[in-house]
A protein has these predicted regions:
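E1/E1-like adenylate-forming module used to activate ubiquitin-like modifiers
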Residues: 109-111, 121-218, 228-234, 245-278
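Conserved acidic residues
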Residues: 113-115
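N-terminal charged helix/coil linker that caps or initiates catalytic domains
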Residues: 1-39, 72, 267, 274-279
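Conserved S-adenosyl-L-methionine
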Residues: 56-61
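Hydrophobic Val/Ile/Leu positions in short beta-strands of Rossmann-like dinucleotide-binding domains
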Residues: 40-43, 64
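Glycine-rich phosphate-binding loop and adjoining beta1-alpha1-beta2 segment
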Residues: 64-104
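Generic hydrophobic/aromatic pocket-lining and core-packing "Φ" positions
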Residues: 51-52, 144
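Hydrophobic/small residue at the entry helix of a nucleotide-binding pocket
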Residues: 46
Length: 279
């Protein structure tokens, strides 16, 4: 008589896989998440939360770009930075990379303590998705332009006090960040310089209000959106800006139309060097 093989279920066996609960969400393509190459630009408050969420969501290949050192005012909004990091003058990108490795030692984390504009022109080309976690409009426009040119999805986040926004840019299907800017924006365009004490800084922008709960909400929306993109759930993406007002308890989804005169869309006609677009 042939013996039948029975699958033995051990009590608690599903608790041995730390990603078991996430894998139970049917639309999440966990294998794609683990293969994806992710770039986080900005390692401050949003970068801390986004980085932590990425690692806990199963992303294994993460690169971080930030030119600044950690300062004391970061500590109320950056869960992964400590007082000793300030005292020793550590770099944001370096410390964030170090702390993400502590959360999951199997994660491959690289870091660059430079302005994104100082990296090679085709630096973004190697990534599958970019997360913008910046307070610098010039850097934001830089990653917007380069990500759009190479056909790489960009999930950009920003906060102001208890309000925040997430903009989703899927080339060439959606508007880009620059599409939503008007003449006033460009007239008032001013770079927010590093707080690291660089000698070449002569103009400073005022410090903006910020607090951790808003940062946490925006970062969560960014990473959830990124999971949808990597899992190819394009129909579930917002079209294409989420606005959050924590004081008024309001979420709004706004559609930003493509500006045909936007230089990124004019340049789109030339597809040389671009990556394959999402289907």
């Amino acid at each position: 008589m042939q013996k039948t093989k029975e699958k033995v279920l051990k009590v608690g066996m599903h608790d041995e896989d730390k990603f078991d609960r996430e894998k139970r969400i049917p639309w999440i393509k966990f294998n794609l998440i683990q293969k994806s190459r992710v770039l986080v630009v900005g390692a401050g408050a949003l970068g801390n939360e986004v980085g932590k969420n990425l690692v806990l969501s199963g992303f294994k290949k993460i690169s971080i770009v930030d030119m600044d050192k950690i300062v004391k005012s970061n500590l109320s909004r950056c869960a992964l930075f400590k007082v000793e990091d300030v005292e020793k003058g550590y770099l944001k990108a370096e410390v964030l990379a170090r702390e993400l490795k502590k959360i999951d030692p199997s994660v491959e984390v690289s870091w660059y303590s430079k302005a994104i504009q100082e990296l090679p022109e085709d630096f973004l080309k190697q990534f599958d998705i970019v997360f913008g976690c910046l307070d610098n409009i010039m850097a934001r426009l830089y990653i917007n332009s380069h990500a759009y040119y190479y056909g790489i999805p960009l999930v950009d986040g920003g906060t102001l006090g208890t309000s925040g926004k997430v903009q989703v840019v899927i080339p060439p299907k959606t508007a880009c960040i620059e599409c939503g800017m008007n003449k006033t924006h460009f007239k008032n365009l001013e770079q927010i310089f590093s707080c690291s004490g660089r000698e070449d800084v002569t103009i400073y922008s005022p410090k903006l209000p910020a607090e951790i709960t808003t940062t946490a909400v925006i970062a969560a929306l960014q990473v959830l959106t990124g999971i949808k993109i990597i899992s190819k759930q394009y129909d579930a993406l917002p079209q294409n800006l989420i606005y959050y007002d924590g004081y008024r308890n309001v979420f709004e989804v706004l559609e930003v139309p493509i500006n045909k005169n936007c230089p990124n869309h004019i340049m789109e006609k030339s597809t040389k060097g671009k990556k394959k677009q999402p289907e």
